[in-house]
Amino acid sequence: MDTNFIQQEFEEAPTRPKRRRTFIIIGIVIILFTASVLFGVGRIVSAAFSAGDDIEGAVESLSTLSFAEAQENVGGAIESAKSARSGLQFIGWVGYLPWVGDYFESAEILLDSGISGGEAFYEVLTIAIEIEGVIDDAEDILADTTVDGSYTFETFPDEFKLELLQVLHNRSDELYSAATKLNLAQGELAKLSELDLSDNFYDKIGDAEEVVSDLADTFEILAPIAQSLDAFAGLEQDRQWLLLFLNNTEIRPGGGFIGVYGLLQMSEGSVEQIFVDDTYNIDQYVEDPEYFVVPPQPLVDYLGVDKWYFRDANWSPDFAQSSQDSIALLRQEFAHVGQPVPQIDGVLGLTPTVMERVLGMIGPLEVDGITFEPETFTEVLEYEVEVGYKDRGIGFEDRKKIVGTLMDTLLDELFSLPIDEWPALFGIVKSSIEDKQMGLYSTDEDTQDVFSDSGWAHEVSTDKIDDILLIADANMGALKTDYAMEREVVYKIDSDEN
């Protein structure tokens, strides 16, 4: 039987060319796959060696304070890390393999955090180079000074202090950028805890996390300070700060009873003068009937006062409001007794807890033959201003002058701190602000915005209307008992259909 056309075509169809094409396609895929792997791995290895050389060069340059060379090396390391990161894209399939995948992901995270951290460090070195220029200009004056970590801010003559502060002030944007990038690096490193990696790897990463965390904390504090340096230090014009020593052993809504206050005058980056006094010394002059300011009703009910005195000014739990009240009441009392009314540009409130932390860093201070240590600071100071002054033959009105002497001594110590100890001091400031042991207020609107954005102002927000309750404690005539009391507060909100 004859075959038809279709059968004939089917039987004669060749099969070898199809197989050959299949093998060719598979071969091309293998070649491309191998090439991509070799290219990706080669790029990663090359970049790793290059980055290692750059990092080693940066460390060596930093050891000799050659900031420009260090910055060049850091820039090279950043580019190498970016090259390695792009190399990973060619072998991305490795990330889907069991066990190996976690290490692949860790490499991505480390490179991302390294790039963020490197870019932050690059910007910091830009500032260091500018500061180095100021130091070079002062070379003749500072001939006997070595800038090696034992170097202190107090070493500089006033004109060079001012120039250094101006550099920081003008570079505040770079400091903010560095802080942001360090936080990004910190966030990337935190992702590693979710991966299944070796303990040895985690130990090494832990060290890196600690360094990045310390740097991030430093720049989170330094950046707003730099932006507000004119308000802080009087770079362009003299500034005067009202210091409120808030005794948290006698709690008030604004932080603590104001037993002592101070006026700190700053001019061109230097402390011009600091005056510290007992609040009762000014309050006693307005006890006459001619002076009257309506006090908050609880002060009348529980303390029996007939007017609002400066010592009770911080009644509001909103630190900005209590600062405004403190400024107003102090100025009114000065005016009433015929004394020059102080122009106040800002308020710094701090509790004894801040002093304890600072002493824990710099060590004990001896003032008027009395040793103040971090563990016993509050008790010793309390004893001296309530009892000990009598044994030393000091009058009642002068019993708190020791606080002024203590502040003078403390400022001398802080300005003499080696540069390499500044990050620890910034850490104390950061923790004290977060714990609300320290608060800041400025009469300048722009500066106050900086404080608010940084979380330093401790304002009571009224933006949210879903939470209308606030707990604010106040010690009303119970003396200095809060230091020994423990509190437990249960704050619970239940929602219903309405």
PLM regions and their residue ranges:
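Non-catalytic, solvent-exposed segments at the cell envelope interface
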Residues: 2-15, 22-29, 39-498
